[in-house]
Amino acid sequence: MSAEVSHATAYADVADALADYFDGLYFSDTARLRRIFHPQAIYACATEGKLLHLTMQEYFPIVDKRPSPASRAEPRADRIVSIEFAGPVTAFVRLHCAIGPKLFTDLLTLIHVEGRWQIISKVFHFDLKSS
């Protein structure tokens, strides 16, 4: 197998894995999110001027409690901007999505462990939609 074919396959595999991420957020479905997030992943943001740093054990209950964008019939704004590889088992993804009034830019680092791509870190910024 050539490196070009391998890279194309890895790109497609990461993009496919992100379907669980996008669907998990849109439907507030932590079962889907647990498939894409490594159990030891971190979640971080400083958009509001201070560090927000959560473990998955802290993050998933927040998702479970919030009304899903799907339940409010919000239009989906999921878009992969880029996927880059640092090596065969490490990928960096920049993507956009929206939940409620927030437009997110997510920077995800994924690792390929246990036979699948998993998010090991999510660092993000958000802007509020214009009224």
Model-derived regions: residue spans:
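Compositionally biased, low-structure terminal segments
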Residues: 23, 60-61, 125-127
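Short beta-strand segments enriched in hydrophobic/aromatic residues
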Residues: 37, 97, 123-124
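Surface-exposed, charged secondary-structure patches
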Residues: 6, 13, 42-103
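Short, low-complexity N-terminal intrinsically disordered segments enriched in polar/charged residues
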Residues: 1-31, 35-39, 57-58
